[in-house]
Amino acid sequence: FKRDARNAGLPRNIRDAEQVKRLTAALRGASAGHPLFVAVDQEGGKVARFQPGDGFPAYPSAAELGRGTPDATRRTALGMGRMLRELGVNLNFAPVLDVNVYPASPAIGRLGRSFSADPQDVAAHGAAFADGLNDAGIVAVFKHFPGHGSARADSHKGVTDISATWSERELSPYRSALGRPGQR
């Protein structure tokens, strides 16, 4: 629904919650009864398509959540998930399971998109975030496999090659998260 006019040439079209509810209802109505994923990229922090300026609640970044407990992360994601569900969204491109290997990373570290530099902390908070979304009826999508936390460039602005910076420890959160019961 919302695009940056500099990137896609489309105006921003989210005005408020009621308008988003009408848009998602219209999408479902046009689906001829077929199941439909209505997805958003709502991580919290700086990556939020539903923004406070449009009347939506602000949510902390992964870096902020990572300084707390996994249970607090789950509760935050549950609240976010309930808000998304009310809007008619059922899939969220979150949480980020990137390990903050390179804090100066323009796409991860600088934006506070990683829970931690410790793979076990990332796994614990990522699982808690997914559980909170799932408890609200939202499908969680883990990203950015195989790991974007060591990237020296922003993949939103071009090809990012991590072959020289990537390490095996960046897989750990994915192994933990995907190895849990009920995860695919």
PLM-predicted stretches and their roles:
Residues 145, 152, 161-162, 168-184:
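Flexible, glycine-rich surface segments
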Residues 84, 133, 177:
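Hydrophobic pocket-lining residues that define ligand/cofactor binding sites across diverse proteins
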Residues 119-151:
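Loop-centered beta-sheet repeat module
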Residues 41, 84, 129, 143, ...:
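Conserved, mostly hydrophobic/aromatic
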Residues 94-97, 142, 184:
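Non-cysteine beta-strand/loop elements that form the S-adenosyl-L-methionine
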